[in-house]
Amino acid sequence: MKKSNSTFKDVFFPVIFLLTSCISSCSDSDRKDKTTNSSTSVNIQFPFPTEHYDEALDGRLILLISKQTETEPRFQLRDDSKTCQGFGMDINDWKPNEPQRFDMEAFGYPIHSFKDLPSGEFFVQVLFHKYETFNRADGHVVKLPMDRGEGQQWNRAPGNLYSTPQKVTIRNGQFPSLTIKLDQKIPPITEPEDTKYVKHLKIKSKLLSDFWGRDMYLGAHVLLPEGWETHPNVKYPLAIMHGHFPSDFGGFRTTPPDPELKSDYSERFNVEGYNRIVQQEANDFYKTWTGPDFPRVIAVKIQHPTPYYDDSYAVNSAAQGPYGDAITYELIPYIEQQFRGIGEGWSRFVYGGSTGGWESLAVQVKYPKEYGMCFAACPDPIDFRAYCLVNIYEDENAYYEEGIFRKTLVAGHRDYLGNVNATLRDMNYRELVLGTKGRSGQQWDIWEATYSPIDEEGYPKRIWDRLTGKIDKEVAAYWKENYDLAYILKRDWAKHGKDWTNKIHLYCGDMDNYYLNNAVYLAEEILSETTAPYYNGEVDYGDRAEHCWNGDHDNGNHISRLRYHRMFIKKYVEKVHNVAPKHADLKSWRY
């Protein structure tokens, strides 16, 4: 997610108190996902935004409080200690001319209750995340935020409303009486245009439209090989890069870095001028892609955002529907037909990091004959005995390591030296502010939306109680049989091993920030014990390497993360003879 460069001035607004209807922060089924103290109301009210909408609205109202003025508060809610304060509450059927207000029942992060807020001067901003109603084929009616071209980002979603930040004084946990107008509306996304090399497409998916009860689409950004137009009889392998929602085919730039580009600083990598490095790497890739020695393949980045996240995790699931089938049997064949792909399983290979790493291994496991090879870097947990630092099968609680006389919070994020800057509990609490019923659009919620069965309302079942951390063992058993990739490999090796051999390649830093290396260790043990046939792939680790190390021992993460295409396309070409049938054309596309 990109960071905003916007700033705001110290603006005071008239203070008005209106007697308004009260709203609850959670539905009855999610009542446990909030803290409750109804002794005092927070007198912040919101007139209905009639200048933007004239119909009743459903959604999530998010109140943000900050001291920092370099960016708007809506861009400051994060997992570490630099976060702003947030509170969230659901709004259902908000009718015109009916103002709403917050009360003390709204759940907060990192401070959970209004009454515990420190005294002082702060900036306050409110954002309304708009939901839509879906009448799904399974009979459930659910309210969710439809993606609107931004890749499921609550603070950037077109159509969402937000207020101009204003200064307030908080004393002893009490707000002054305020009226906050949702006077700003996020504009639509501008779609990228086709170029000589990059083409953009979108198709209506019948499978997904049938499931969701409305038209649903899949998209792709397609990078054509050098010489595609002048070699009309050549068919090409398909290089599919999985990962978070791509707004364009990033990392490919036909011109040198912008000489007027203002240098920035990467907090993650501690590098000055990182934006210039990114542009230079993109231009270098263009030169490599069009150069005489690079393999000629079609490279693709897929758009498959769902009402739960910026992508579907590329598999079928109870809450999100048949995204795995839609991508594999609708979108990919369409791309191959449009741009002369070879269209056989051996000629399709997948790669990606983090989310894209899990997806790459998942589609190889779930569709063993439809894909010829996978390269999975820093994958999300591929063995749920190490769901980050939680063993969902044996641990009783996800948030604490518990003994007779004490309990210790479980870490959620570390640096390469092991310094912890976020706990798993707080990461989950932040998501709870952004949305109940799995609707935050964030990491822990999408794992549940992907792996879990649905509850009686049609939303994903929790793997653990979001307030207490108590693990639901029935849900864990469902996860194991359907989405624990390492377990499935072991369980089904006798059946599918011949279709997995030579195809699985895993890479992870041994100091991954999210402890993802732990699951890779367990998966490696399973793979190393395979026989008849042996898996004959690769597992590699980077010493003290953080998220998202991808097998590059020569460059730091800040460089290697920009070279996925160059690295894995070459690896595929080096190994393709191991998976291609005798009749396969391995020459015509090597001009």
Where are the language model's segments positioned?
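Bacterial Sec-dependent N-terminal signal peptides
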Residues: M1-S41
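A short, compositionally biased domain-edge/stem linker segment
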Residues: S21, C26-D33, F48-T50, L182-T190, ...
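Small/flexible residues
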Residues: S4-N5, V11, D33-K34, I62, ...
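A diffuse structural propensity rather than consistent per-protein peaks
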Residues: T7-K9, F13, I62, P322, ...
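Short, solvent-exposed linear motifs at loop/edge-of-secondary-structure regions
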Residues: Y53-T69, Y329-E330
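Non-catalytic cap/lid and distal C-terminal segments of serine-dependent acyl enzymes
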Residues: K67-F107, H112-Y591
